[in-house]
């Protein structure tokens, strides 16, 4: 950071992101007294931002909770092994580096030129969930932000025919872990600017050489075009995800359409 203007911008932005993070945590009761929170740190802008916000909140919160940072070294070629340990040591944060060669497995299974992100993320999730259980972690914190949630909603809508996004808090399918997304109310624009001002040592996410998920790229571009025409478009879409009327949809599991009968008419 080079000048006072940047410092002032950082201070203002940090307060803004911290406020949104605290709102999400409070609204969804993400953190409880005595929690042991595992921050999944990839070396990307969002996970750095998540760790910073939780460390700031830890100092101010009326409750006590523990934070550990965990990185999964998947043995991708060119992965800078020293970056995260050096950063976390300087921050004074307890951390663990898990080493698993998932890269070789993914390369063996996925055909050349195809995106490896799906299989890679499933394997990564399983390893991190196992570590959380073995180390008595009560909450697994992920760095997904508002834009990730909106993009996932449209991916499921356009390509899977389902109305589904990313919840701010969930109990894993196997009931072994609780996952939280404290940055759920924070935009990608905010995490990007914050990471640039903080000068985080970013580790590229494409070391594996995988192609981008073209469906997600399409959705992101579409949303950005909408946002250019209407700067509040993403906010309105995000608001809609917490303003759902099951009786106005078509899902018989969410609303009892079958048993609506003439006997219900009141005149």
From Swiss-Prot:
It catalyses: cytidine(32) in tRNA + S-sulfanyl-L-cysteinyl-[cysteine desulfurase] + AH2 + ATP = 2-thiocytidine(32) in tRNA + L-cysteinyl-[cysteine desulfurase] + A + AMP + diphosphate + H(+). Keywords: 4Fe-4S, ATP-binding, Cytoplasm, Iron, Iron-sulfur, Magnesium, Metal-binding, Nucleotide-binding, RNA-binding, Transferase, tRNA processing, tRNA-binding. [4Fe-4S] cluster binds at residues 117, 120, 208. A motif (PP-loop motif) lies at residues 42-47. It is found in: Cytoplasm. The keyword Membrane does not apply. Pathway: tRNA modification. Its cofactor is Mg(2+); [4Fe-4S] cluster. One of its GO terms (molecular function) is 4 iron, 4 sulfur cluster binding. Binds 1 [4Fe-4S] cluster per subunit. The cluster is chelated by three Cys residues, the fourth Fe has a free coordination site that may bind a sulfur atom transferred from the persulfide of IscS. SUPFAM superfamilies: Adenine nucleotide alpha hydrolases-like. It is an enzyme of class 2 (transferase). GO terms for biological process: tRNA thio-modification. One of its GO terms (cellular component) is cytoplasm. Its EC number is 2.8.1.-. The thiolation reaction likely consists of two steps: a first activation step by ATP to form an adenylated intermediate of the target base of tRNA, and a second nucleophilic substitution step of the sulfur (S) atom supplied by the hydrosulfide attached to the Fe-S cluster. Catalyzes the ATP-dependent 2-thiolation of cytidine in position 32 of tRNA, to form 2-thiocytidine (s(2)C32). The sulfur atoms are provided by the cysteine/cysteine desulfurase (IscS) system. Belongs to the TtcA family. Homodimer. HAMAP family: TtcA. This is tRNA-cytidine(32) 2-sulfurtransferase 1. It comes from Francisella tularensis subsp. tularensis (strain SCHU S4 / Schu 4). The lineage of its organism: Bacteria, Pseudomonadati, Pseudomonadota, Gammaproteobacteria, Thiotrichales. The gene is ttcA1.
